């Protein structure tokens, strides 16, 4: 088959940016195992995607919807954020208390016990 040019595809999708997005999305779909609508003819996925667009063998509306769904980000609702905040608060409450400050004499005694191997209930 003759080489596919952007001019062949611009007639089908007039906006070059949208054309690139649609062709790239279709090429990714082909890479993911989507069924081809034309013969591959030993072409790579981007070329096959452009040929499919130029030959109008694709349903452009479903391809556009698939592209939009793939680009959308799902933002958490306020209820989910509140629940996550509450859960983090409960986790913070479950943390052990901060270490107790020791004066110099208690610190010296603890260090000597560690050195001498005196049992203090630790494993």
UniProtKB/Swiss-Prot annotation:
Name of the top EC class for this enzyme: transferase
Tell me which UniProt keywords the record has, alphabetically.
DNA-directed RNA polymerase, Nucleotidyltransferase, Transcription, Transferase
According to the UniProt entry, the coiled-coil residues are none
Q: Which GO terms describe its cellular component?
A: DNA-directed RNA polymerase complex
Q: What's one GO BP annotation on this UniProt entry?
A: DNA-templated transcription
Instruction: State the family named in the UniProt similarity comment for this chain.
Output: Belongs to the RNA polymerase subunit omega family.
What is known about its subunit structure? Answer: The RNAP catalytic core consists of 2 alpha, 1 beta, 1 beta' and 1 omega subunit. When a sigma factor is associated with the core the holoenzyme is formed, which can initiate transcription.
Q: Which PANTHER family match?
A: DNA-DIRECTED RNA POLYMERASE SUBUNIT OMEGA
Q: What is this protein called?
A: DNA-directed RNA polymerase subunit omega
């Amino acid at each position: 088959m003759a080489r596919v040019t952007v001019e062949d595809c611009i007639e089908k999708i007039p906006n070059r940016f949208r054309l690139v997005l649609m062709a790239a999305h279709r090429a990714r779909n082909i890479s993911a195992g989507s069924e081809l609508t034309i013969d591959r003819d030993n072409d790579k996925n981007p070329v096959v995607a452009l040929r499919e667009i130029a030959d109008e063998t694709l349903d452009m509306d479903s391809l556009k919807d698939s592209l939009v769904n793939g680009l959308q980000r799902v933002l958490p609702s306020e209820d989910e954020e509140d629940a996550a905040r509450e859960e983090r608060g409960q986790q913070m409450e479950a943390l052990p208390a901060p270490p107790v400050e020791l004066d110099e004499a208690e610190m010296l005694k603890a260090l000597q016990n560690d050195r001498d191997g005196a049992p203090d209930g630790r494993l």
